[in-house]
Amino acid sequence: MYKRQVIKSTVESVAENTTDWAVAPIFWSAIFGGLGGILYRTVNIIDNTVGYKTDTYINFGKFPAKLDDVLSFIPARIAALLMKMNVSYLHLDSKNASQVYKKDRRKSPSPNSAQTQSVCAGALGIQLGSDEYYGGQLVRKPVIGRNLKPCEPNDIFWANQLLLGTSFYAMLFTAVIRTALFFVI
């Protein structure tokens, strides 16, 4: 892999996994306590390990993959909204982030992964996705974002800042939910 491809793949992974690693576990913990977060991560890890896209696990992995899509549906959209807030806070390109989000958020085969990828790509002015080789096989991915500039090492820093800030906002959101549930129940 060339340097720019490594950078692009890293940014793409951080952006996509903002939901899986942070916002969704926080969201499900807010609703069902720590067990909700643990159960979500368990389903997500099983999906990532034996998802139905390989012939070996087609029968076993289909259910966890679909369940992960369902469990991540609301958190992915919350993550995109929180990430857009963080884009503004970090003084990145919020206008482009919103435009790319509106245009590209449904481009991925997964109903959830392009939500945060599109915000991140727009905020950084880069393009994610495209055809790449993994393990010697061509994998076709939809193009997300506008190629306003080439990927640079600094983009990894900003993608991580978006992940961390979005996680912080998710924790604040969770505190509000848990407090509301405490007084309602």
Regions found by a protein language model. Give the residues of each.
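Hydrophobic alpha-helical transmembrane segments
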Residues: K3-I38, V43, G51-I185
